[in-house]
Amino acid sequence: MAIQRTFSIIKPDATKRNLTGQIAAKFEEAGLRIVASKRIQLTLAQAQAFYGVHSERPFFGELCEFMISEPIVVQVLEGEDAIVKNREVMGATNPADAAPGTIRKEFALSIGENSVHGSDAPETAAEEIAFFFSGLELVG
């Protein structure tokens, strides 16, 4: 198994409820290292650019408004099979379908306010990391 990096967002519903530390602990307990992290307030333009792949979907506007409603925490996670491991720790997109002990099962409010985002493939991880971090900010 190879050491990988993946991208994670702790979303507004979770930061608003002060869950950042508990969510970060779940990543670390799963063997993922946080090699970059920052709390930011997205602008509408940034949210629209980041989620541009969804621009034609009916939920795009609502998603962007949600993502600018409160600060978010963007992170780069590193570890063996980090992308798969992160997705396992997050749980299913719909918290009703998420396994016990996962972030979404424990903390998500709904399918829309599901507390976290994680990259789904090496290519998207690289793009998403580069959107928020310079190489100098990645320490590990």
From Swiss-Prot:
Keyword set, alphabetical order: ATP-binding, Cytoplasm, Kinase, Magnesium, Metal-binding, Nucleotide metabolism, Nucleotide-binding, Phosphoprotein, Transferase
EC code: 2.7.4.6
Pfam family for this entry, one: NDK
Residue positions binding ATP: K11, F59, R87, T93, R104, N114
Catalytic reaction list: a 2'-deoxyribonucleoside 5'-diphosphate + ATP = a 2'-deoxyribonucleoside 5'-triphosphate + ADP; a ribonucleoside 5'-diphosphate + ATP = a ribonucleoside 5'-triphosphate + ADP
GO biological process assignments: CTP biosynthetic process; GTP biosynthetic process; UTP biosynthetic process
NCBIfam families according to UniProt: PRK00668.1 (NF001908)
Record function comment: Major role in the synthesis of nucleoside triphosphates other than ATP. The ATP gamma phosphate is transferred to the NDP beta phosphate via a ping-pong mechanism, using a phosphorylated active-site intermediate.
Protein name according to UniProt: Nucleoside diphosphate kinase
Organism whose genome encodes this protein: Jannaschia sp. (strain CCS1)
